[in-house]
A protein has these predicted regions:
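Membrane-embedded alpha-helical bundles that constitute the cytochrome b-like, heme-associated redox core
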Residues: 1-177
Length: 177
């Protein structure tokens, strides 16, 4: 690789908007998730817990069209890199996309199990996808565990972006800015 970055094709505006809006929402979700009070039983969500639920709905509502857009658009030219690195990048992106759906869906199942309203305020509600059940706490633990996996994947993604910028100097980071 050369020491001077070359111009790599940029992602389109909608892709960048999806990426950065979800990045901000996920960062907010982690900040809230780490500071909100523990959830017990079926007591209705209030304060930070309610905000966490509402932002989770918003995250899911953005993740689905983002996935559809990602599948529908023409991919931009890939930067040349070793096969093993390309495999790791593709695997990480696949797991990131999956986690951005799985974590909110587990939260939704957790909320359903606790008989909580899941929506954005009083004007929009998601349908129940599970009947009230006694597994709410267990599903809540799965939600937290998968969120930890998501945090690790985000860390890998950020480290890779910085490595592309400062070590490989191949313009990959600039494609999403």
């Amino acid at each position: 690789m050369s020491d001077t970055p070359h111009q790599a094709a940029r992602h389109d505006r909608l892709t960048r908007l999806f990426h950065w809006s979800m990045a901000l929402l996920v960062a907010a979700q982690f900040a809230i998730g780490w500071t909100m009070p523990d959830v017990h039983g079926t007591a209705p969500p209030l304060g930070l817990v309610l905000l966490h639920v509402n932002l989770g709905v918003l995250l899911l509502l953005i993740a689905v069209p983002r996935l559809l857009w990602s599948g529908a658009r023409r991919p931009i030219a890939q930067v040349e890199q070793p096969r093993a690195l390309a495999f790791v990048a593709n695997a990480t992106h696949t797991l990131l996309y999956a986690s951005l759906i799985v974590v909110p869906v587990l939260g939704w199942l957790n909320a359903n199990g606790r008989t909580w309203h899941v929506g954005l305020g009083s004007g929009f509600s998601l349908p129940a996808i599970a009947a009230p059940h006694t597994l709410g706490a267990t599903i809540g633990e799965l939600h937290s565990a998968w969120a930890t996996v998501l945090a690790i994947l985000i860390g890998l993604h950020a480290c890779a972006a910085l490595a592309h910028r400062f070590v490989m100097k191949d313009g990959v980071l600039a494609r999403m800015l």
